[in-house]
Amino acid sequence: SWKLWGDVNVTHFNASNPGTIQVPLIDNDSRITRGMTSLALENHYEKTSGALSLFYNWGRHKINDGYKTGEQPQTSHFNSKDKMLGISWYQSATFFTGNRLTVGFDYQHFGGESWNKVLATGERKPGVDKQMDEFAGYVDFRQDINSWLSLDAGVRVDHHSHVGTEWIPQGGLAFHLPKSAELKAMVSKGYRNPTIREMYMFAPANPELNPEKLVSYELSYSQRLLEDALYYGLNLYYINGDNVIMSNGLTPPLNVNSGEIENWGIEANIGYRFN
């Protein structure tokens, strides 16, 4: 079967910031309009399913920073517009019992521009005008090896027009134990590209930022009891990261990449369904 659907959403709002009682602000007003639309075509069959989707998001902002008592009104107002559009496709298929293979592709284009409009003359003083593209392809494979063991592995290749290409692998094993218990072990890589704001906008901006990266190791145990009414779990994790984006804490501030970071811990959860 096939399914086609779409949606459109447009929102506009005006906002005013009066400041505090001690330090009131005058004319600190914002006019914000944002819109989003998407279109998707899905397919569902006995051994395969997938979807092709397109999206477009945009925004328009007009902001008066206002002034304090005793100061002069702003002579120019901040303006900006931004957009993000893209396409996403995936198809998942089962070739034999206990198997699931998924392949997919993502593309997105994003960016925007900002400027200050001089009230007296209408002159437009340019600020930031940046556009970026990101392409990604991925494969995910899941296989039930037998009744008590499942394997999950995947890799994603991401190319960003500013920072280049990154490989993101992940893999895990799930042990299906007696009495509705399960033990999972997983290792995965994650990363985050710096945003246009972090690289190009306002005082901390730094165009030389590198993407944040981390590797996560996780071991978890869970079980269901009392006819699945009671659920509890325990999770151990260790994360090793690099290049976390942060402010250097100086004046003027500057966004920088940190050195290595480590984080580890234990999480526990429990739930009970009464009816």
Give the location of each predicted region:
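Transmembrane beta-barrel strand/turn architecture of Gram-negative outer membrane proteins
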Residues: 1-8, 37-42, 49, 82-93, ...
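Flexible loop and strand-edge segments within Gram-negative outer membrane beta-barrel domains
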Residues: 3-51, 56-84
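Transmembrane beta-barrel strands of outer-membrane/channel proteins
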Residues: 6-12, 52-58, 103-109, 153-157, ...
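Outer-membrane beta-barrel translocator domains and adjoining extracellular loop/strand segments
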Residues: 8-11, 16-25, 54, 62-72, ...
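Structural signature of outer-membrane beta-barrel domains
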Residues: 11-16, 34, 46, 57-63, ...
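Outer-membrane beta-barrel signature, preferentially recognizing the C-terminal barrel domain
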Residues: 22-44, 80, 130-132, 176, ...
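Outer-membrane beta-barrel transmembrane domain signature of Gram-negative proteins
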Residues: 31-33, 44, 56, 69-152
